[in-house]
A protein has these predicted regions:
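Enzymes that bind and transform nitrogen-containing heteroaromatic metabolites
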Residues: 1-142
């Protein structure tokens, strides 16, 4: 098992705007510049929180965003989106149950990442920095 965090923050350390928006992210870097496609091609599983999933829903077709991975959303709500499974509980315990032969991408957010970091379960942090200043927002590390 290998657990990765791959994401982008602003120059002032935020991974999302104050209202959890990611508009700033969509305006920076192409897939070629960020090596996103290469990274994603090696992943088996994505993990994300509800707010990250809500941003993905705004695309209109969330299943097309992560079409080749098993996708889990930590939430206490039901999901009606094909290709995504709602889960709850401790992210570290959940990851332990996924199996050894998996490449797991923690898409976001910090409430999913922090417990995994606390238990030294993250094998690789890939943090890209966008030339953007938000002034306030949701930090990657709290």
């Amino acid at each position: 098992m290998a657990v990765y965090f791959y994401g982008c923050i602003t120059l002032d350390g935020y991974m999302a705007a104050k209202g959890h928006g990611l508009d700033w992210l969509y305006d920076t870097g192409s897939p070629e510049e960020t090596s996103y496609d290469e990274f994603y091609s090696h992943m088996d599983v994505t993990l994300m929180g509800r707010r990250t999933f809500q941003e993905i829903e705004k695309t209109g077709d969330p299943a097309s965003v992560y079409p080749t991975t098993e996708n889990y959303v930590f939430t206490h709500r039901e999901l009606s989106c094909p290709g995504f499974t709602a889960v709850s509980g401790d992210p570290a315990e959940f990851v332990k149950k996924l199996g050894q032969d998996r490449s797991i991408w923690v898409v976001g957010g910090n409430t999913i990442l922090a417990p995994l970091l606390d238990q030294n379960m993250v094998d690789c942090l890939i943090v890209q920095v966008a030339p953007v200043l938000l002034g306030e927002g949701i930090p990657l590390f709290t």
